[in-house]
């Protein structure tokens, strides 16, 4: 897997011990949830996003507990388009369900977003221009076929 090789190369270059845990890519689970809750027409940043944050943080908390981690968190707070306060509130609520703590963050503070762009260039990390949600992509006028071609090209160049 490209991600595993990237992490291995990154660790060798930097002397770090970063680990990568891949979650299943199951967009249909999200789409089912959206349909069940009738969230198809919600605006970006509305109830659909809140439900997505809840779903994703629940998955992360469950995995953190399974692996014996003390904390779980989210890189979603890096995006200038995402509500860090809301994400953190959801994480703090979810920690009550699992025996694992949520680590609140707002990575965009102190030029965090700018620094993330710099680091992605420095370490040759692929960045997409939206959160991954098909609704957000459509709202922003993003050509998903073009995004897919760019991602495939990036992956091939890594091999």
Language-model-detected regions and their locations in the chain:
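Nucleotide-activated chemistry modules centered on ATP-dependent adenylation/adenylyltransferase
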Residues: 1-159
């Amino acid at each position: 897997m490209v991600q595993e090789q990237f992490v291995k190369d990154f660790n060798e270059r930097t002397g770090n011990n970063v680990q990568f845990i891949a979650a299943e890519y199951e967009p249909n689970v999200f789409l089912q949830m959206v349909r069940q809750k009738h969230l198809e027409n919600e605006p970006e940043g509305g109830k659909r996003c809140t439900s997505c944050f809840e779903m994703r943080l629940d998955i992360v908390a469950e995995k953190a507990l399974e692996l014996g981690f003390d904390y779980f968190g989210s890189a979603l707070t890096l995006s200038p388009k995402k509500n860090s306060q809301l994400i953190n509130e959801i994480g703090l609520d979810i920690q009550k369900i699992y025996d694992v703590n949520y680590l609140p963050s707002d990575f965009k503070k102190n030029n965090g977003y700018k620094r993330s762009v710099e680091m992605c260039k420095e370490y040759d990390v692929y960045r997409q221009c939206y959160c991954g949600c098909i609704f957000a992509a459509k709202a922003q006028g993003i050509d998903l076929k073009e995004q897919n071609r760019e991602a495939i090209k990036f992956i091939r160049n890594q091999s």
